[in-house]
Amino acid sequence: LSKRLSGASAVYKLKSNYDLTNTNTLEKLADFTVPAIPNGFLTGGDISPDGKRVIICDYFNAYELILPEKAKNFDEIWKEKPKIVELGTREVGEAVTYSADGNSIFATSENKNSPFIQVKRK
């Protein structure tokens, strides 16, 4: 996922059989935007432990994508509309991840002593 000041971010994929000895070329899968201005300025993201969800954050919110049950592969997740996940107050959101069991989302901001936020999934 590219980080851009304006316009859509691009989603790229590295082949699972990448070559450690040569240059690898990423495949562009999609353009990705969120409702924040300017397009979210995305700062972090994670794939859920079960491989069925993606969480992405910008400075203010998090956005979750859910893989449709009938999807043929994970790449189809990028066709879904992101749903806002409220994280509470963060100064400058920088990181977001799923808990090991996938039942919570953790987030934090940049700088020292930033709060560590936990949001339980419903």
Regions found by a protein language model. Name each.
Residues L1-K122:
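Sequence/structural signature of beta-propeller domains
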